[in-house]
Amino acid sequence: MDKKRHVHFIGIGGSGMNGIAAIMLGLGYRVTGSDLKPSAATRRLEALGATCYTRHAEENLGDADLVVASTAIPPDNIELVEARKRGLPVMHRADLLAWLMRRQKGIAVAGAHGKTTTTSMTALVLEKNGMDPTIVIGGELSEIGGNAKLGRGEYLVAEADESDGSFLKLDPVIEIITNIEDDHLDYYRSVENILAAFRRFMAKVPESGLAVACLDDPRLRELLAGYDRPCLTYALDNPEADYTMRNIRLMRQVTAGDVYYRGGFLGCLELSVPGRHNLSNAMAAVAVGRFVGLAFEGIAAALKDFRGAGRRFQLTGEVNGIKVIDDYAHHPSEIKATLKAAGQVKTGRVVGVFQPHRYTRTLFLGERFGEAFEDADVVIISDIYSAGEKPIEGVSAKTIVSAIEKHNGRKVIYLPTRQEIVDYLVQMARPGDMILTMGAGDIWSAGIELVKRLKENQKIG
């Protein structure tokens, strides 16, 4: 790697790619990349000195001596084919992240849900306490002005992507595992295979390192039985964990609880972000912070300043008392947690707008979506965002609509397109409503358009 000076990223705007590209720029590498359209991520990289092309073409490679791609890039991609024709080394994004992690001590955050928020919280704890970590996150963290930052300290904090098994390429010193769910079954095919992958991941922890695991999660409890590496556990509901929380307060302005370590009181933890699940995420950051030598008071102060990660209960806008919030939630458990958080801070109706993500996820988890929307007063479902998948016969957004109606016994509003959703919401929204756009696709843009339309109507009125 040290002899390679020009790195080309195929799909440079992707959430797993652009942060690594930014770090490579900071290390002095020449960075080029391609994507199908410009984005905030590509514009930010260009401001840092990268060259970003808005189409895939052989000539984009230029004189690159290393090409980086993710699992999302198909093998017949024109740039990938050209790179192999030239005999250029092609590296998976996780291999490059692993190389970066070897330059420092890696802290990797894995799990079905909460990775981005927990990574952001952990990174902020180290950053605010003067440890100057390198940070690579899948979402935006306002405190660092993006999703990546090159630090000169001892640690690198990063998300570990289990969706394609590539987290097994990493060799962190510290691991956080938030939970294990039956997601990404298009890759793993069975829960047993998911558990086997996490077992291998946890076995990577060295004797000098630490695994931090949530004891509230039943599948993690299963993996921890007989686990022989250094480990600390945390929980909100399991008193056997090393880190526990009592006196939990879920209020409109603050989310708080009292933190204990092996029965000893450490102090109160207050968050500005809503949701009981965020207290759990914060407990993982507390465990890591104390392991690397930080005082609880400094950790708690940093977490109190945390304003949330991009697309994680993020305010899109507020017009005439109508709040529009966006969240990446796309798994039933994530949707349930997001809507419960909304219930904590709502002043009127909670309107859940969900764009299903992938045909395979809808196929495998369709019935479980039925119970995910219990805390929404109004539910709107759009067509599936395919993420490049081919349609599956008999699987559609109506699979989820039927599951919700069967579970809740009430009508779900099916609006296939974002435009239909915006038109409907402009007419039905009223002061006090909290409208949540949820999904891993492009449903966020409906929220932006809705805020724009509501503002226009306000001017006319």
From Swiss-Prot:
Pathway: Cell wall biogenesis; peptidoglycan biosynthesis
Cellular localization per UniProt: Cytoplasm
One Gene Ontology CC term in the entry: cytoplasm
Keywords per UniProt: ATP-binding, Cell cycle, Cell division, Cell shape, Cell wall biogenesis/degradation, Cytoplasm, Ligase, Nucleotide-binding, Peptidoglycan synthesis
Domain of life from the UniProt record: Bacteria
GO BP terms in the entry: cell division; cell wall organization; peptidoglycan biosynthetic process; regulation of cell shape
GO molecular function: ATP binding; UDP-N-acetylmuramate-L-alanine ligase activity
Catalytic activity as recorded in UniProt: UDP-N-acetyl-alpha-D-muramate + L-alanine + ATP = UDP-N-acetyl-alpha-D-muramoyl-L-alanine + ADP + phosphate + H(+)
Pfam families linked: Mur_ligase, Mur_ligase_C, Mur_ligase_M
EC code(s) of this entry: 6.3.2.8
UniProt key word ATP-binding: yes
InterPro entries per UniProt: Mur-like_cat_sf, Mur_ligase_C, Mur_ligase_C_dom_sf, Mur_ligase_cen, Mur_ligase_N, MurCDEF_pg_biosynth, UDP-N-AcMur_Ala_ligase_MurC
Main EC class the enzyme belongs to: ligase
Binding, ATP: G111, A112, H113, G114, K115, T116, T117
Family recorded in the similarity comment: Belongs to the MurCDEF family.
HAMAP family: MurC (MF_00046)
NCBIfam families named among the record's database cross-references: murC (TIGR01082)
Function: Cell wall formation.
Protein name: UDP-N-acetylmuramate--L-alanine ligase
Taxonomic placement: Bacteria, Bacillati, Bacillota, Clostridia, Eubacteriales
Protein's gene: murC
